[in-house]
Amino acid sequence: MFNLIRLELKKESFKWYGIGTVIANLLILALIIPIQYVEKIETDEMFMIMGALIRAVFIIFGAVLLSKLIIDEYKNKTIFLMYTYPIQRKKLITAKLLLIGILTFITISISSALVAVGYFIIHNMFQISPDTIPAQRLIVEIVSMLKFAIAAAGASLIPLYFGLRKQSVPATLLSSILIVTVITQSNPWFSLADNIYISLVAATIGVFIAFWTIRNVDKVDAI
C-alpha cells in the first residue's frame, strides 16, 4: 500500500500544494490579526476562527486533490489504464484516498501549529488585545485544533461522492465549499465551528463514502 502511495507522489506534482499551503497560512495570519485588533474579539473566539479558517481552506484543498487524483482520471478515462496493471482496483483507489486523507490531516495539523504560534508571538509582542496568552494556553489550543484536524481529514472525502456521481470537477469543488460553509458556521447564538461532534459526524460520512467507493470499484467501470 505504501508503495502505491509513493507511486502517486511520484506520478503527480504536489508543488502547487506546498506553495498553496504556505500562502494560505500567511493569508490566514494576516487576516486574523487586524480582525482582532479592529473588532476587539476575545482570544477564545480568535482561536476558534483560526481553526475554522484553516480547516475550511484545506478541506477545499482536499477537494482539489480528489479532482486531480480521481475525478479527472475517471472523466478522462486515464484511470482505466491503471486498472490494467496487475494490482487490485481496490488497492489503487485506497492508496489515492489514503494519500488525500493523510495530506489533509498533516497540512491542517502543521498549519494549525504554525498559525497559532505566529499569532501567539505577534499578540504578545504588540499586545493586540487586553487578553494575555500564556504558553500553556497555546499548547491547549493547538491540541484542540489537532482533534479537529482528524475530523476534517475524514470530512474532506465527502466531495468524492458528488464528484464521482457527476464525474465533474466543479461538482467536487462546490460540494467542498458547501461542506465547509456548514461545519464552520458560527453566530452569536450557536456555533458549529467549535462543535467536535458535528465535525466527527462529517468525518464519519466521509469515511463511509470512501469505503463505499472502494467496495464498489470492482463492480463497475465507472463509479
Describe these PLM feature segments:
Residues I23-A24, N195-I223:
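Alpha-helical transmembrane segments of multi-pass membrane transporters/translocases
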Residues L69-G101:
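Helix-loop-helix units of permease transmembrane domains in multi-pass membrane transporters
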